[in-house]
C-alpha cells in the first residue's frame, strides 16, 4: 500500500495538530519509531520462527503508524532524539527475543499495554475538549491496532501468571516507557 493510500485509509490527510497536542504527537512519533525498531531487533533472532512471524505481522502495523505520525507532524515538531529511540527499540526487541518467545510476548504485551493507556489519554483529552475529532479518530484506529498486538502477545504467551522476573521486566518496561514519553514530549 502506498503512503497516500495509507493516509487515506486512516483519514489523516487534512488534519492539523492543535498546539496543545504537539508534545503528545511528538511522543507518539517517537514511540512508533521505537516500536518499528523493536521488531527489527527481534527479527535478528532468525532461528525462532514464532518470533519471526509475530515480528513480521506486528512490524507492518507499526510501520503504518509511523507513516501516519510522519505525515501528521512537521519535521521541526518531531523528537530530536530519534536515534536514541531506534537504539532503545532495537535493543529491547533483540534482548527480549534472545530470551525466548514467551519473554518476547511478555515484552510486547507490556509495551502495548502502556501504549494503549497513552493513546487513551489523548483520545479522552480530545473528546473532553471537543477538538480535532479527525485526529481523535486516527488515534482510535492506532489504539485499536495496538490493543490487537497486546491481545495477540497475551494469547501467544498463554494466560498463566508471569514469573517474578517477568513481572519485574514488565514493570521496568512500563517505567522506561513513561520516561521515554515524558522526554519525547519535550525534545
Give residue spans per PLM region.
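Non-heme di-metal
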Residues: 1-187
Amino acid at each position: 500500500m502506498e503512503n497516500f493510500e495509507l493516509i487515506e485509509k486512516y483519514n489523516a490527510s487534512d488534519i492539523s495538530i492543535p498546539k496543545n497536542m504537539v508534545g503528545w504527537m511528538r511522543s507518539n512519533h517517537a514511540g512508533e519509531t521505537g516500536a518499528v525498531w523493536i521488531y527489527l531487533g527481534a527479527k535478528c533472532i532468525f532461528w525462532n520462527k514464532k518470533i519471526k512471524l509475530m515480528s513480521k505481522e506486528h512490524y507492518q502495523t507499526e510501520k503504518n503508524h509511523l507513516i501516519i505520525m510522519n505525515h501528521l507532524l512537521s519535521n521541526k515538531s518531531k523528537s530530536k532524539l530519534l536515534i536514541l529511540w531506534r537504539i532503545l527499540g532495537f535493543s529491547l526487541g533483540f534482548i527480549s527475543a534472545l530470551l525466548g518467545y514467551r519473554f518476547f510476548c511478555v515484552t510486547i504485551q507490556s509495551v502495548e499495554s502502556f501504549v494503549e493507556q497513552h493513546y487513551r489519554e489523548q483520545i479522552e483529552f480530545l473528546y473532553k475538549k471537543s477538538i480535532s475529532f479527525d485526529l481523535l479518530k486516527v488515534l482510535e484506529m492506532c489504539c485499536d491496532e495496538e490493543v490487537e498486538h497486546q491481545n495477540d502477545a497475551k494469547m501467544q504467551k498463554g494466560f498463566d501468571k508471569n514469573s517474578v522476573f517477568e513481572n519485574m521486566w514488565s514493570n521496568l518496561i512500563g517505567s522506561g516507557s513513561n520516561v521515554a514519553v515524558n522526554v519525547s514530549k519535550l525534545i
